[in-house]
Amino acid sequence: MTHTAPQPADQPVFKNAAYTQEYINIAESLDGDIPGRRAARAYMDSSTAIVHHRVVSTSFVPKLYDTASRQVMREVVETTHRILCKVMQHYLDDAEYRKIFDYDPRLAELILVPRGYDALLPFARFDIFLDENTGDVAFCEFNGDGSSGMNENREITHSVEETATFKEFARRHHVEGLSLIHI
């Protein structure tokens, strides 16, 4: 599934690149914000963002999304969730439809076990690529079985939000965290 955002001629679709450049310019105006970088690194070194027994590496420059890019991602993810729920419900309701999936019989039996809650897909992670020049979106993968990256994202965000660079950027713009639980 690909989604293309409407765009006026000769206009960038999103402000993300401009936000990133502004953030870098702020850091440069603060002589690189060396104290902020050191504090961010120290935070990460004592954080829970650990993969394969190592603290994750990160950039001092966070990924900055404007409202338009968040809206595109929200629409794509919510539409995809609705489609997947319809497919899942049809699978549960129609024995003939289940045949096209060719699941191992043990798995098919487990899928049909009553859930005990209303949501068909209570948790999902949709990994997408957003082309910030065109607004096109492409999927990398769908996950309904894990929360990979959520802790790391939270810790990386916390590592920079007390820096002088981040505070100055946030003074100029409305900034809020990008929740991996719900966009």
Model-derived regions, located:
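Preference for protein termini
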Residues: 1-181
